[in-house]
Amino acid sequence: MTTDKLTSLHITIPDLKGMLPGVETTVSTAFWVPLAQFVLRRSGTFEVVCMREDTGAIKLLMPVAETIERRREDGALMFWGAVTPEVTRAVVGGHGSGHESLWWWQIALTCDGDQVFVLQDYGEHMDLFGLTGDETATVLDLLPFAARTARSMSATGTR
């Protein structure tokens, strides 16, 4: 009996830290649209956290989220629900293209109760879980060069 080893990718793109719409960055964020499409296809449910000042992102998610809750400690808004075509359009496209579509402070995606994707700090840190070899290669091909030089991979607990 053979089992496929599943891989987790831990991606860091420091130049994206705190990036907000309209702020120039040295890293192209063109990778976001195909990466978001990829991770959302693997997901059943989503959780997105928007900081209070992320009004554009909040307006995008308000009509498509099943549940919305304000976090007491920092006033951030948390959105939950099933991944639907409407959610995919909002998360993938944002209000525009390029860096304007990477508006999300935190994203967690799950499939059948297992976490499959986590994004933090507007994309500075991303984790993908349970990838096959082919899926890993696909994701690595999508990433900007800055992330390729700073990535680490782990398979079944080894780094």
Annotate each PLM feature.
Residues 1-159:
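Structured alpha/beta or helical-core interaction and ligand-binding surfaces enriched in interleaved
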